[in-house]
Amino acid sequence: MKKLRKRKMSTYLSDYDYFLPEELIGQKPREPRDSAKLMLIDRKNGSVEHKNFYNIIDYLQKGDILVRNATKVIPARIFGHKDTGGVLEILLIKRITLDTWECLLKPAKKLKLGQKLYIGENKELIAELLEIKEDGNRILKFYYEGSFEEILDKLGSMPLPPYITRKLENKDRYQTVYAQRGESVAAPTAGLHFTEELLNKILDKGVEIVDIFLEVGLGTFRPVQTVNVLEHKMHEESFEISEKVAKIINEAKAEGRRIISVGTTATRALESSVDENGKLIAQKKDTGIFIYPGYKFKIVDALITNFHLPKSTLLMLVSAFYDREKMLEIYNLAVKEKYHFFSFGDSMFIY
């Protein structure tokens, strides 16, 4: 195990590293969803408990507000072929206009401006390369008949992160049970552990559940490559918080009730939308918020989250919520206890 430097508010990237055996990277979801392991971390006394996710109900209280990211993941990975027969992988990243998308192509250099790709046995989708961006991403215009969403659902596969090498048998397992709308290209994975039954039990306990939306982009997997983490350019994602939800959360905060965020995506949205008086603002906008140790949380009181990649901005976020040194000790403990890590991994509740 790596020795921890004695710097709690470090900006050194190496201070957010830990050793993870490859076999602990979750390759398939736990069945059922709420059977995942759950590590419980009490920030007041530093105690750590090991349970299953369905036990989380015992740690929720009447009056708590549970905030979910109800975004929907689209099957954004498709394959197209050129007239010459060459095959390219297309990963939809962000919709620009109704029929135009920013995409990642592999191999990217095989397609020239104006060239077309044909997708599906019957060429249900045709993609034309309109622009090559400075960062290497491509702008594609799609031609089709009928509903783009229905065609994509038929031809596309879920855009699993690169560390998951096993084929996903069921698309729904990379989707929360409460997903409603949106065009995310990665799942808000902390929410994957909830079942309908567990959510109903949580409601019956007197916990209020509210939904916000943040469209999760590929930037969530982008590694930090700068030695000083403050030099890292944070990706931007769009989010939406309704007037109704803002009112519920502000009233709960005023009454001293807990705001429990399901995942880092919900956390980033909430913490990006606070006025100078500490009130949550209802709005729809983009956020590039970078949360690292030293940040003072204004809305979130407790956090449900998975175990994140070494040297990632998400590990920095949870280190800001608790304590960098203690968090890395907890990660080392999770390795020892054979927890599963990353998107299809196990969960922790920091309260």
Curated annotation (Swiss-Prot):
Uppermost EC category: transferase
GO cellular component: cytoplasm
Principal location class: cytoplasm
Xref: InterPro entries: QueA, QueA_dom1, QueA_dom2, QueA_sf
Molecular functions (GO terms): S-adenosylmethionine:tRNA ribosyltransferase-isomerase activity
Catalytic activity line of the entry: 7-aminomethyl-7-carbaguanosine(34) in tRNA + S-adenosyl-L-methionine = epoxyqueuosine(34) in tRNA + adenine + L-methionine + 2 H(+)
Swiss-Prot/TrEMBL keywords: Cytoplasm, Queuosine biosynthesis, S-adenosyl-L-methionine, Transferase
Single Gene Ontology BP annotation: queuosine biosynthetic process
SUPFAM superfamilies (alphabetical): QueA-like (SSF111337)
Pathway linked to the protein: tRNA modification; tRNA-queuosine biosynthesis
Cellular localization per UniProt: Cytoplasm
Gene3D superfamilies the record matches: QueA-like (3.40.1780.10)
Disulfide bridge partners, by residue number: none
EC id: 2.4.99.17
Known role: Transfers and isomerizes the ribose moiety from AdoMet to the 7-aminomethyl group of 7-deazaguanine (preQ1-tRNA) to give epoxyqueuosine (oQ-tRNA).
Family listed: Belongs to the QueA family.
Subunit annotation: Monomer.
Name under which the protein is recorded: S-adenosylmethionine:tRNA ribosyltransferase-isomerase
